Amino acid sequence: MEIRILYKAVGKPWQEASIDNTLGAMQATVGGYIETARIAKNVVVVCNEEGLIRGLPYNCRVMGTDFVGDIFVVGTKGEEFVDVPVSLEDWQRYWIGGGNGND
């Protein structure tokens, strides 16, 4: 089953995407082991757990936290990942303050 995410590759703008709701697909999306950072009750940023250790390039800041490497935003329901509950337009307007998220 696929889930809808908001994806941001290093140096690229945010985009809507879908990935398989599997650990392997999530690891492939961030290029390694995953780590989550909760930014709201039902929303997390998924990033590469070893991004800083591996010296991955800076990506962006989300809700006051800097991220390196490719990341994505997804919704949560309990312990499960679900479709991201916000549109790309609302994400850019309300969550990251407009622009392309490269700040």
State each model region's role:
Residues M1-D103:
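Domain-length accessory/inserted modules outside core catalytic folds
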